[in-house]
């Protein structure tokens, strides 16, 4: 049997392998598939080359999973509206996978990660037209909350959706989805097997917060309100 795997605008044909599973079984074992998804993401994040000094450990988030499920049930092979992808004040990113047969979640995540074959750290996609956004979202250092869901849309159409909070793939930084260096180099006292466990609880609203804080410190309420991560997270990953 041939399985058709689609990643956004990229279509590829895969041979059926041992990675295929019964969809009902995969969907019903909620705790099992949550652990499989989180463990797979963290394993891949630990294995990046070059290694990452600021890679956060991912954890499951039920709100992100609910948002992913609502979108998966629409059976639409397109990204959900950004305003529907939020967890608290965090905006979330999204990866989508479609197949003509069910896949194990570990296989879905691996397919996204495999775009690394056309990605060069510090340069970006190579050749430039290559699709690599799924890979960069999987390994985006700051994305640490994860929620995923799937839907059987027809006998030959299965949709898988993961949402990542806060969102990755920030314009201007896509070529460096994390900071290279020794594992946990930026979090030596908050490290779990190569991944940082100290995410900042705040999120900056401006892209130039480091410059603003360096120049003006955090002396005004405006800067503190717009740049809370830079102002208040001195030892956490931001």
Swiss-Prot record:
The keyword Nucleotide-binding does not apply. Belongs to the CRISP family. InterPro entries: Allrgn_V5/Tpx1_CS, CAP_dom, CAP_sf, Crisp-like_dom, CRISP-related, Cysteine_rich_secretory, SCP_CRISP, ShKT_dom. It is found in: Secreted. Residues 200-233 form the ShKT domain. This is Cysteine-rich venom protein pseudechetoxin-like. Disulfide bonds join 75-153, 92-165, 148-162, 184-191, 187-196, 200-233, 209-227, 218-231. Keywords: Disulfide bond, Ion channel impairing toxin, Neurotoxin, Secreted, Signal, Toxin. One of its GO terms (cellular component) is extracellular region. Residues 1-19 form the signal peptide. GO terms for molecular function: ion channel regulator activity; toxin activity. Blocks olfactory (CNGA2) and retinal (CNGA1) CNG channel currents. Does not affect neither depolarization- nor caffeine-induced contraction of smooth muscle. Expressed by the venom gland. The keyword Disulfide bond applies. It comes from Pseudonaja textilis (Eastern brown snake). Residues 38-164 form the SCP domain. PROSITE patterns: CRISP_1, CRISP_2, SHKT. Residues 20-28 form a propeptide.
